[in-house]
A protein has these predicted regions:
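Thiamine diphosphate
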Residues: 84, 88-96, 114, 118-120, ...
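Cofactor-binding active-site loop characterized by glycine-rich and histidine/acidic residues
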Residues: 11, 23-147, 153-154
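Short, surface-exposed helix-loop/turn micro-motifs enriched in polar/charged residues
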Residues: 18-22, 45, 198
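Conserved alpha/beta enzyme-core scaffolds, especially Rossmann-like or related mixed alpha/beta domains
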Residues: 20-23, 134, 163-166
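A short, structure-level motif marking secondary-structure boundaries and short turns
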Residues: 1, 15, 49-50, 133-134, ...
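Electropositive phosphate-/nucleotide-binding environments in soluble metabolic enzymes
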Residues: 2, 6, 23-24, 58, ...
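N-terminal capping segment at the start of a domain
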Residues: 2-17, 165-167
Length: 219
């Protein structure tokens, strides 16, 4: 995670743009997912049985890109031109340009719906993979997230794991000053989710929570 942080900060400095705060706050969980949890292979990025990942808070691309590169999907040199004209790495990552990306991002509020779609598609095709969706507390002031949460519960999509970056900040300021979303744990529980609050910079807590979610799906 420390290496990815350095790459992210360097990319922001070079292109003089980006969303460093919301990117740096997710690098620990991205590191746990890619380097410990997810079944993904840079040599076979389109493996139909791979786990899926959706970066719903797509503006964290300057943090996601370094992880993708460090894991071997793309050469790290590509980050040297992050968000510059002609670069494959833009402010939002494009799955048609970056290997290892399951879906492109853009407008906030749609990632969990995409994750539900991945899970339902796998069920129809008889495939059993995990789907991880990383969202943020600021993003959760959009109602489409809660419609997607209701859908996941309705169809018992236990292989969908929602990871909320509860950093309490958004581009307009503090989340509570814009739209209060807490208590997030009680809200998700009301929709039928099993919820665990952890320290987002504690690798063990993150790993244990994700492993619990996987075990819950398998059981």
């Amino acid at each position: 995670a420390a290496k990815a942080r350095l790459l992210a900060v360097e990319a922001v400095h070079r292109c003089a743009s980006g969303h460093p705060g919301g990117s740096l706050s997710v690098l620990d969980v991205l590191t746990v997912l890619y380097f410990h949890t997810m079944r993904v292979d840079p040599q076979n990025p389109a493996d139909p049985d791979r786990d899926r990942f959706v970066l719903s808070k797509g503006h964290a691309a300057v943090g996601y890109g370094p992880v993708i590169c460090d894991y071997g999907f793309m050469p790290v040199e590509g980050l040297h031109n992050f968000n510059l004209t002609g670069s494959k790495f833009g402010m939002h990552l494009d799955k048609n340009k970056i290997k290892g990306i399951d879906c492109s991002s853009g407008s906030l509020g749609h990632g969990l719906s995409l994750a539900d779609g991945f899970a339902l598609a796998g069920r129809v095709k008889g495939q059993d993979y995990m789907v991880y969706c990383l969202t943020g507390d600021g993003e959760l002031n959009e109602g489409s997230n809660w419609e997607a949460a209701m859908t996941a519960a309705q169809f018992k999509l236990s292989n969908v794991v929602v990871l909320v970056d509860n950093n309490k900040c958004m581009i307009d300021g503090r989340v509570d000053d814009e739209m209060k979303v807490e208590p997030l744990d009680k809200k998700f529980e009301a929709f039928g989710f099993k919820v665990k609050r952890v320290d987002g910079q504690n690798m063990k807590e993150l790993n244990d929570a994700i492993e619990d979610a996987i075990a819950n799906h398998k059981n």
